[in-house]
Amino acid sequence: MKLKLLTAVFATTALLSGCGGNEVGDVGLGWFTLKDIKITSLQDEVVTGVTCHIASIEANLSLSDPSDSSISCRQTGSITPEMIAKIDKSSSGEVVFKQSKSIFFKTMKVRRIYDQKNQTLLYLSYTTKETEGSFKHSLSTVPLWGTDAYVAPSKTEALTQ
């Protein structure tokens, strides 16, 4: 019975760890730990000129709860007004990436939020347990300054600020 349960846990963990973006880095944390830092590359599917890299702890053969992650997003191609017109401009933005992080219903999400006043894309990475949980997060910004999508403020707007 215990062997079947252990086999099921390992199989589920292996399946869940394979979900997600493109792995570009894998750093082992030592001989006496089963944990690694995995670095994943994610290109925004709507704003294709933005690429994010997410670093997170992966413990494939462990029942630990890997919540810590960091995100860094940069402009890696052109960003057009048409791309910005297609995105969700609400204050909560939209989820652009989701990956299961453990067998305990924890999911890592990346949400894109548009700061219209500062013409900046915000990418918020966070993990949450669907039933309850601690919320850890990381933020990266991509300003539109210097892109085709940037709209220069008018002189009257600049004087009133």
Model-derived regions, located:
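Bacterial N-terminal signal peptides
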Residues: 7-14
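Bacterial signal peptide processing site
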Residues: 20-22
